[in-house]
């Protein structure tokens, strides 16, 4: 029984290994096909019609930039053939040819642009900065005093021992403080843009209703003699 289990497990392992091998071969073939399709047609003209590419005449969002240019070139070739076969519009056969030339120019323009960007990120690309006017970064970093990592403070947090240290270069200029405090600050009347001119005019001329227009705005008449805490009535007079 144990021998049968071992044989069955061995067969399963062989089957899985064969499947993995076929998957690797398929992925390799698929990647090589994608790399071969991503070649501009001037380097391999047969790529326009090889492996079913002759049906790809309209660009899609899944295509690369080179595949889009190849598809447009293929479309221009088909249009040129149609214009030549139809004698009535054979004079328009030059239009697709002009578009093909434009596609070639676009390819070389984008290719040069990408090559320049690649060189800019290359380590061997020469430095275009003016080193005479810019100090060396390493020298600047060596001159400055940086907090170093220690066992008791691995995150370089500010500790109580750091308070009051590192300020040896501060200038004790006692004249600057009162001079800056006596500076005149002027706040303009208009603090918004555009200014609130309409609100300002309403505040000046748009008076609220008075007692003459609305009696609810009139002050209530109160007789001081009958107020509850009238000092003239409640408090005793000196002669009493």
Curated annotation (Swiss-Prot):
Location of the protein in the cell: Membrane
Transmembrane segments: 12-32, 66-86, 89-109
Statement: the UniProt record of this protein carries the keyword DNA damage: no
Residue ranges that the Swiss-Prot or TrEMBL entry lists as coiled coil: none
Topology versus the membrane: Multi-pass membrane protein
Signal peptide residue numbers: none
Pfam families linked to this entry: P9_TM (PF19066)
An example Gene Ontology CC term for this record: membrane
Positions bearing carbohydrate: 129, 157
UniProt xrefs under InterPro entries: P9_TM (IPR043915)
Keywords: Glycoprotein, Membrane, Transmembrane, Transmembrane helix
RNA-binding in keyword set: no
Name of this chain's protein: Uncharacterized protein R468
